[in-house]
C-alpha cells in the first residue's frame, strides 16, 4: 500500500508538471504570437477584420465546447464508464458525431450567409467596403476551425478522464506555433496565412488526439449499436446541453 501511494503521488506530480509546463509554453508562445501580430498586422482596418474572423469561431467554441464538455459530457461519460466501458466508448462517438454534425452545419450556414452575419455582428464594417469584403473572405476560411476545436474538446475530455493530460494541455501551444510560423514565412499575406494556419493547426490537433485515443484502444464508430442502452444517458446529455448552451450563450 505504501509503495502504491508513492507511485500514485509520483504520477500526480508528473501530470502536474506536464500540465504546468504546457500552460507556461502556451503563455510564452501566445506572447510571441501577440508581438508578431502587432508587428506584422498593426492596428488598421484589415487587422480589425482579421480579429473579427478569428474571434467568432472562438466565441462559438466557448458556447459549444467549454461549458458542455466540463459540466455535461464528462460526468455522464464517467458514470457510463463505471457501468460498461464498451458502451461508454459508443457514448463518446455518438456525442462526437453529434458535435461534428452541428458544427459542420453551422460552418455551412456561415459560408452561405457570411455577409449577413458580418452585417449583424460588425455593422461598422459596412462603412468600408474593402474592409467588409476582407472580413467576409477571412471568416469563410476561419469559421470551420470551430469544427476541429469542438471535436478536439470531446477527445481531450476523454483523455483527461483516462489520466492522459499532456496532449490536451498542449493543444493551445500547437495553435500558437502554427500561427507564429505562418506569420514569419508568409509576411506579405499575413492575414490569410493566419487564417489558414488556424485550419491546419485544428486539423493537426484532431489527428494527434485520434492517435492518442487509438493508443488507449478507443476507435471511431457510429456508436449506434448502443443507442438503446444509452437512451437514458443521451436524454440527460441533450437536456443538460441545452441548458448549458442557453447559459453560455447569455454569458457570451
Tell me the role of every PLM-derived stretch.
Residues 7-252:
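Membrane-embedded alpha-helical bundles of multi-pass transporters/translocases
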Amino acid at each position: 500500500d505504501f509503495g502504491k501511494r508513492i507511485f500514485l503521488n509520483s504520477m500526480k506530480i508528473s501530470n502536474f508538471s506536464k500540465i504546468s509546463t504546457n500552460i507556461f509554453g502556451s503563455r510564452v508562445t501566445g506572447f510571441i504570437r501577440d508581438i508578431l501580430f502587432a508587428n506584422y498586422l498593426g492596428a488598421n482596418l484589415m487587422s480589425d477584420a482579421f480579429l473579427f474572423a478569428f474571434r467568432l469561431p472562438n466565441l462559438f467554441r466557448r458556447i459549444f465546447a467549454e461549458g458542455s464538455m466540463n459540466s455535461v459530457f464528462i460526468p455522464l461519460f464517467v458514470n457510463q464508464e463505471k457501468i460498461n466501458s464498451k458502451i461508454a466508448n459508443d457514448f463518446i462517438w455518438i456525442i462526437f458525431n453529434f458535435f461534428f454534425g452541428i458544427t459542420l452545419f453551422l460552418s455551412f450556414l456561415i459560408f452561405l450567409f457570411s455577409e449577413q452575419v458580418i452585417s449583424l455582428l460588425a455593422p461598422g464594417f459596412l462603412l468600408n467596403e474593402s474592409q467588409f469584403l476582407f472580413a467576409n473572405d477571412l471568416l469563410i476560411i476561419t469559421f470551420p476551425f470551430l469544427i476541429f476545436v469542438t471535436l478536439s474538446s470531446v477527445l481531450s475530455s476523454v483523455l483527461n478522464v483516462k489520466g492522459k493530460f499532456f496532449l490536451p494541455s498542449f493543444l493551445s501551444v500547437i495553435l500558437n506555433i502554427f500561427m507564429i510560423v505562418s506569420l514569419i514565412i508568409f509576411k506579405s499575406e499575413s492575414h490569410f496565412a493566419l487564417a489558414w494556419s488556424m485550419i491546419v493547426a485544428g486539423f493537426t490537433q484532431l489527428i494527434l488526439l485520434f492517435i492518442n485515443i487509438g493508443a488507449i484502444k478507443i476507435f471511431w464508430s457510429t456508436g449506434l449499436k448502443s443507442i438503446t442502452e444509452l437512451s437514458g444517458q443521451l436524454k440527460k446529455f441533450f437536456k443538460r446541453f441545452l441548458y448549458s448552451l442557453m447559459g453560455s450563450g447569455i454569458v457570451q
